[in-house]
Amino acid sequence: MGDVVADALEKLSADQIEQFRKYFNMFDKEGKGYIRATQVGQILRTMGQAFEERDLKQLIKEFDADGSGEIEFEEFAAMVANFVVNNENDEGLEEELREAFRLYDKEGNGYINVSDLRDILRALDDNVSEEELDEMIAEIDADGSGTVDFDEFMEMMSGE
């Protein structure tokens, strides 16, 4: 088992591994111990996991290095972990950012003004210059409204 697979499996709980095994077995009907690489997307959809087709293709390429098209359970679990663990982390990050946003959105009107944003950015990095702050704020508040809504805030904080 490669390092990439071992590292990914370490991040999974016993419950997650058991769940992945059930889905894997649903598609490995003959008990061969592997599934076709082309089935991974179907399984992710069955699990209700969102994914980008290009990300999936890249992972399959990474885990099916010999190009055989056969994915064993450990490889499958490691691949799926990339989607499940990342999605859970994204949800946690979004909730944390939403909470931080609410702290600065004192009136509860769905936006914060750029002076509050300046305070947030300065708190995150006290070495940032006024010029750098101006540049960051201009980029974040692209429409020049003087306010930042949650989506703009989320994009800035998560880099997405």
UniProtKB/Swiss-Prot annotation:
Q: Which PROSITE patterns match?
A: EF_HAND_1 (PS00018), EF_HAND_2 (PS50222)
Q: Which residues bind Ca(2+) 1?
A: D64, D66, S68, E70, E75
State any single GO MF term: troponin I binding
Tissue specificity, per the record, is: Pharyngeal muscle.
The EF-hand domain is annotated at 15-50, 51-86, 92-127, 128-160
Report the SS bond pairs.
Answer: none
Listed GO CC annotations: centrosome; cytoplasm
Q: Where, in this chain's numbering, is Ca(2+) 2 bound? A: D141, D143, S145, T147, E152
List the Pfam families hit by this protein, alphabetically: EF-hand_7
Query: Does the record's keyword annotation contain Repeat?
Result: yes
- Tell me what else is known: This protein binds two calcium ions.
| Similarity annotation | Belongs to the troponin C family.
Name of protein: Troponin C, isoform 2
Record the organism: Caenorhabditis elegans
In the UniProt record, what gene is named as encoding this protein?
A: tnc-2
